[in-house]
Amino acid sequence: MLSLQCLPPFFISVPNRSTNSCSTAPLRAVSDFAASPSTSISRRLILLRHAHSSWDDLSLRDHDRPLSKTGEADAAKVAQILSSLGWLPQLILSSDATRTRETLKSMQAQVDGFMEANVHFIPSFYSIAAMDGQTAEHLQNIISKYSTPDISTIMCMGHNKGWEEAASMLSGASIKLKTCNAALLQAFGNSWEEAFALSGPGGWKLEGLVAPDSSIFV
């Protein structure tokens, strides 16, 4: 069982641990990297599940469902918490589903720093999240494609079950992400590709979990 220590507000620092409970596809490994601890750069990854969506219009496709009023408020709260923790992304990679777009819109309206990030909407984030054990490797590939060495913090916005699986596989902890919950992960490398290669599955440090309220489930 993980030992949790509460930090204000609504942030929990979580020790890293290894587990074999996640049944997922292996991440691509690169054995040629040789990072020096003195020069290796911190790479911070935010895995954020979209905020609560509305089911009022049952004629809409799942892809097109908007946020509920609760979801809009929760997204604004999480944006403020991430800002207060100093976890503002320079690059945002998001599913193109309406509820993820609107989650980002609410975050940008609350905190100007989210407006400054470079944003790419990735259609495959919507579909990959439904496939068993595929999300972590897909995130690695997309992040490696869009990142540059000067970017230290990236936020990926998407859906369950894939986002929970990816957070669990990368950190080695058993992570549950409710709507608008975020896992904060850290690794080191002179590039994002190197950080993934050196850390491997289970090697990303789980720095904490963020939620719009004080209910955190690990």
Swiss-Prot record:
Keyword Chaperone annotated: no
Keywords: Chloroplast, Hydrolase, Plastid, Transit peptide
Gene3D superfamilies per UniProt: Phosphoglycerate mutase-like (3.40.50.1240)
Protein EC: 3.1.3.-
Location (main, coarse): plastid
Compartments, record wording: Plastid, Chloroplast
Any one GO molecular-function label of the UniProt entry: hydrolase activity
InterPro entries, per the entry: His_Pase_superF_clade-1 (IPR013078), His_PPase_superfam (IPR029033)
Top-level taxon of origin: Eukaryota
Broad EC category: hydrolase
GO cellular component: chloroplast
Pfam families: His_Phos_1 (PF00300)
Transit peptide: 1-28
Entry's family note: Belongs to the SixA phosphatase family.
Protein name in UniProt: Uncharacterized protein At3g52155, chloroplastic
